[in-house]
UniProtKB/Swiss-Prot annotation:
Protein name, per record: Elongation factor Tu 1
Record EC number: 3.6.5.3
Keyword tags: Cytoplasm, Elongation factor, GTP-binding, Hydrolase, Magnesium, Metal-binding, Nucleotide-binding, Protein biosynthesis
UniProt-annotated stretches for the region G3: 81-84
GO molecular function: GTP binding; GTPase activity; guanosine tetraphosphate binding; translation elongation factor activity
Gene from which this protein is expressed: tuf1
Cited function: GTP hydrolase that promotes the GTP-dependent binding of aminoacyl-tRNA to the A-site of ribosomes during protein biosynthesis.
G4: annotated span: 136-139
Residue numbers binding GTP: 19-26, 81-85, 136-139
Region (G5): 174-176
Region annotation G2: where it falls in the sequence: 60-64
Amino acid sequence: MSKEKFERTKPHVNVGTIGHVDHGKTTLTAAITTVLAKHYGGAARAFDQIDNAPEEKARGITINTSHVEYDTPTRHYAHVDCPGHADYVKNMITGAAQMDGAILVVAATDGPMPQTREHILLGRQVGVPYIIVFLNKCDMVDDEELLELVEMEVRELLSQYDFPGDDTPIVRGSALQALNGVAEWEEKILELAGHLDTYIPEPERAIDQPFLLPIEDVFSISGRGTVVTGRVERGIIRTGDEVEIVGIKDTAKTTVTGVEMFRKLLDEGRAGENIGALLRGTKREEIERGQVLAKPGSITPHTDFESEVYVLSKDEGGRHTPFFKGYRPQFYFRTTDVTGTIELPEGVEMVMPGDNIKMTVSLIHPIAMDQGLRFAIREGGRTVGAGVVAKIIK
């Protein structure tokens, strides 16, 4: 049992494979689990186990995703792989599988293709912080100059979307040969694992980030004051801490005079816990659902932002018809809907169900937001799209 216990103390990092269709993402995923299991222990996963990915729902959207796990000597990885291009788009936009870093798979036989570019762009828009490149099918290319050319193209493409193309690790390998147990190609998988360990920094745990609690409910308790309830999204809140109430109205400061959970008084509330926070000198009507409690100065309210959006298809329960500029749906952030207007990119007249699109949104009330915040687009309580804040305008 002692081994199991030790495993859990390793840092946990979320990664995934991205790249063009048929460039070998799933084969590479299988190869990583197989080679690392052989060298460092753990469970190997066969190609077909990964390829028939189970359906899951994220924000009402059906996504096919495979989750595998593997270990290196220093870390534990959770790795996500999607069978289809549409699944990647949905996955990255909804944040169903948050990635601390991605492995971009490019076939050396093809070089960068349209989805290579699209996945890099999506990675930039949704805030995937690090990309490592696996140049696949190198066993089928014996021309060194060609490999160098493909490598150069990939680096240029990464730089175009503000990733550090010149410094990005690129591994030349063959996922299939590694999966088949050929030693020289297995080495390349170990080399890739080494880059995962060193190039992707250890993610900051939610509990170490600045305190944030999306407010779900507000009520007043006679003789004690106003209590807000919700689930702590990140950080820790302690009795006596000063906090800001951010969003919808002007930002206000107050002090937390008590933290309670299941009607018991605590000293603190931590990320992941459902708590009630008693606020000093704050009236019930000054606060509403949709605002957040936050560490002072850690988050600001905004109305205008650029976003990357996936519009649900009719089959997913989305709209049956396209929408045009001047569309005014509700944008659901954390716990509340806010009406907003949209601007479409130049030359785009309409958006069809099933499309993914970049759009600029202007909300009628400010919402506490930072880059990477996820939201749903709703019409009368029905989800018709999912999006992520790519850039704050004002």
